[in-house]
Amino acid sequence: MNGLITVVMPVYGRAALVEQAIASVRNQSVPHWRLLIADDGSDPPTEALLRRLASADPRIDLVRRPRNLGLFANLNATLAEVTTPWLLILCSDDLLEPEAIAVLEGLIHRHPACQLLLSSYRSIDAAGALRFDVNGWYTDQFAPVSREFAPGELLPVLLRFGSINGNITGLLMRRDLFERTGPWRSDWRQAADWEWLIRAAERSRVWINRQPIARVRVHGGQLSNDNRVDQREGEEIAAVVRQLRDHPALAAWPQRHRWAAYHAQFLLWNALKAWPRVGWRATARQLALIHRGAGLGRTALALLAVLPGRLRIRGSDRPLPPPAP
């Protein structure tokens, strides 16, 4: 199995956390792995740390971008440099469980028809303490145990439940699947993984692995939080929702309009909350995006329908339940 999996780690700063992430790879229970660190133009202290850690282990390779490309452009460039058959993504603020590589190698050999594996993970806070696992709670609704999905079978799941991976950490794919599916949208910052999953799920069998193989950190400095503050997520999420709603494979699913409106109501909620800060012009643009993605009327009704649920979970880390089947 030597040379089966390369762990790909995109890095941009966060020196204190990236050292822990690299240590979690080096502490794997099996020795036959590769780690490819893609430094996306980090600050000098982080660059120096990465060079020191890479020089300490021959299994670690380091590439450095002369300028910051952004997460998905950096990943596109990095995945093109992977030479092993499989690649596993690990974000620089997350951790692999010690048995992760061993577990994934076993799954690869037991399910050879699956070229994409999405694994559960444990959710931790900034200090590393376990917290409520929102993504696992959602996954319980459609895959309470590990199971295989045929090509195209995940498309309704991706519309009803959203970006089911929840995070790119733990995403394991065959290199040739990435080549056939095409790159992530490098001009996107929030929903590029969701959009890419649509294309990948059309082409390959997918294994949903419910054994956690990583610890994913939730903290205020994440890119997703930055995108939400300045509303960049609206355009991308509305586009993905519309893509799924109008997908030919879902034409016979009348629920698709209701599911699309459920996701769009989050955008409407955020747009209304941001209105005093961003003004009418920016809010009107968000409303237009929502209308194109799911229909403003349907979305407003969906928002009203979930308001009682919002009040019940206010102040907690519990999520809204997914839309009905």
Pin down the residues of each PLM region:
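Short aromatic/hydrophobic "clamp" motif used to bind/position activated sugar donors
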Residues: 87
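Conserved nucleotide-sugar donor-binding catalytic segment
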Residues: 7, 138-237
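Conserved donor NDP-sugar-binding/catalytic core segment of glycosyltransferases
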Residues: 99-138
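Acidic helix N-cap motif at the loop->helix transition within catalytic regions
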Residues: 44-52, 95, 99
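C-terminal subregions of glycosyltransferases and related glycan-biosynthesis enzymes
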Residues: 159-161, 194-195, 202, 218-325
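Short, acidic, metal-binding catalytic loop of nucleotide-sugar glycosyltransferases
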Residues: 23-32
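Glycine-rich, basic loop-to-helix element that forms the pyrophosphate-binding segment
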Residues: 65-82, 95
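A conserved acidic beta->alpha catalytic loop
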Residues: 31, 39-48, 67, 91
